[in-house]
């Protein structure tokens, strides 16, 4: 699984619209800015909600939690979303 596919999996996990039973990523305009440093891997996501409200979502992954994770993506299993549930800290602001 590529890094892009992994990002999409995370987006689907956190933008899931429970009321409509659909994935909000298909209804939102998403802009992704990726910043990588020696210890942190950050995703800054700006999206437009269906109702045209702006949301800013910040995901931060502690790279030390994924020792060898990005160097060997073949180690991923179908449960890669669980890794994001454990490793992501997220906040929403209107």
Curated annotation (Swiss-Prot):
Keywords: Endoplasmic reticulum, Membrane, Transmembrane, Transmembrane helix. The keyword Transmembrane applies. The chain crosses the membrane at residues 24-45, 53-70. Its main location: endoplasmic reticulum. GO terms for biological process: protein glycosylation. It comes from the Eukaryota. It is a multi-pass membrane protein. It is found in: Endoplasmic reticulum membrane. GO terms for cellular component: oligosaccharyltransferase complex. Pathway: Protein modification; protein glycosylation. The keyword Transcription regulation does not apply. Subunit of the oligosaccharyl transferase (OST) complex that catalyzes the initial transfer of a defined glycan (Glc(3)Man(9)GlcNAc(2) in eukaryotes) from the lipid carrier dolichol-pyrophosphate to an asparagine residue within an Asn-X-Ser/Thr consensus motif in nascent polypeptide chains, the first step in protein N-glycosylation. N-glycosylation occurs cotranslationally and the complex associates with the Sec61 complex at the channel-forming translocon complex that mediates protein translocation across the endoplasmic reticulum (ER). All subunits are required for a maximal enzyme activity. Component of the oligosaccharyltransferase (OST) complex. Belongs to the OST5 family. This is Dolichyl-diphosphooligosaccharide--protein glycosyltransferase subunit ost5.
């Amino acid at each position: 699984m590529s890094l892009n596919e992994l990002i999409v999996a995370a987006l689907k996990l956190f933008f899931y619209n429970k009321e409509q039973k659909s994935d909000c990523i298909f209804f939102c305009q998403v802009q992704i800015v990726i910043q990588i440093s020696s210890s942190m891997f950050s995703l800054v996501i700006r999206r437009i909600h269906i109702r045209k409200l702006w949301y800013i979502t910040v995901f931060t992954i502690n790279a030390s939690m994924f020792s060898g994770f990005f160097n060997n993506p073949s180690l991923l299993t179908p449960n890669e979303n669980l890794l994001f549930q454990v490793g992501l800290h997220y906040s929403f602001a209107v």
